[in-house]
């Protein structure tokens, strides 16, 4: 299979997956590198794309605090776009901590991944204690990483940082903690979602697994049927499409290549290939 790395003249690339921003490299970074790079570029994480014996490539996702995330939906789509362009592929497979994910690269505006898991571990929960004005009923779901979905009537009135931090460390979800998604239903097939991400410890402009979690819970509680299609808008105002078809659930949206490390100003270009 022919391979042409996008990193032949630089060490890192800066990607955005519908507003989720990442540094991408093709060798395993040190913890110090992850912390420095994420802080310097103010990004949500580091994507390490390497060779795989069971897929087109292997992806390791680092949160901006240096911890490893078992899954990142928008990061996975960025990695798929990167690998698709390196190998000249349309169908792409990526090995992750949660198994091998299959995706399809149509264009940078349309990168799709099959996010189906055998068990989403969905459960409605009543919180043991809440902050003033916060709903008591929430929904837990695992879309590769754990999420708590909170439906509200008006997202503009939600203090995302305060409520998000409170729920992320809530004793009901200890010790691992959760990502927190605040959701407003705009139409039958349109959700507005703001996410506080574990590992970033703040609200991010977009979160693929959070948008997926919100759509899956909405499909259940609003009885949208087994085969559904929901558009999800994040803080970045990018739209992600979540749809179910023949028992599988897909995440689809745009990916952008924002910058290369020779333009970052603080790195020397260095050739690097995985494989």
From Swiss-Prot:
Keyword NADP: no
Catalysis: reaction(s): (2S,6S)-2,6-diaminopimelate = meso-2,6-diaminopimelate
UniProt-annotated binding residues for substrate: 20, 63, 73-74, 179, 197-198, 208-209
PANTHER family: DIAMINOPIMELATE EPIMERASE, DIAMINOPIMELATE EPIMERASE, CHLOROPLASTIC
Site (Could be important to modulate the pK values of the two catalytic cysteine residues): 147, 197
Example GO molecular function: diaminopimelate epimerase activity
Designated name of the protein: Diaminopimelate epimerase
Residues annotated as the enzyme's active site: 72 (proton donor), 207 (proton acceptor)
Pfam families assigned to the protein according to its UniProt record, in alphabetical order: DAP_epimerase
């Amino acid at each position: 299979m022919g391979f042409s790395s996008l990193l032949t003249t630089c060490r890192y690339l800066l990607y955005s997956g519908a507003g989720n921003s990442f540094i991408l490299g093709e060798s395993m970074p040190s913890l110090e590198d992850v912390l420095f790079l994420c802080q310097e570029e103010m990004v949500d994480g580091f994507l390490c794309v390497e060779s795989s014996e069971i897929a087109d490539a292997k992806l390791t996702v680092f949160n901006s605090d240096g911890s490893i995330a078992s899954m990142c939906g928008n990061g996975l789509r960025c990695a798929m776009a990167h690998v698709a362009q390196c190998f000249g592929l349309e169908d792409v497979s990526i090995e992750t901590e949660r198994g091998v994910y299959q995706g399809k690269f149509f264009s940078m505006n349309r990168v799709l991944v099959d996010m189906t898991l055998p068990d989403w571990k969905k459960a409605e929960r009543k919180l043991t204690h809440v902050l003033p004005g916060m709903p008591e009923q929430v929904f837990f779901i695992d879309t590769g990483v754990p999420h708590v979905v909170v439906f509200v009537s008006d997202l503009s009135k939600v203090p995302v940082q305060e409520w998000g931090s409170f729920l992320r460390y809530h004793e009901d979800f200890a010790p691992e903690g959760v990502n927190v998604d605040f959701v407003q239903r705009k139409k039958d097939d349109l959700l507005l979602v703001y996410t506080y991400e574990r590992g970033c410890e703040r609200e991010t402009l977009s979160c693929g697994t959070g948008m997926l979690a919100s759509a899956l819970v909405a499909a259940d509680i609003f009885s949208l049927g087994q085969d559904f299609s929901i558009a999800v808008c994040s803080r970045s105002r990018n739209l992600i499409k979540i749809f179910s078809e023949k028992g599988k659930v897909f995440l689809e949206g745009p990916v952008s290549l924002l910058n290369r490390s020779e333009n970052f100003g603080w790195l020397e270009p260095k050739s690097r290939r995985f494989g």
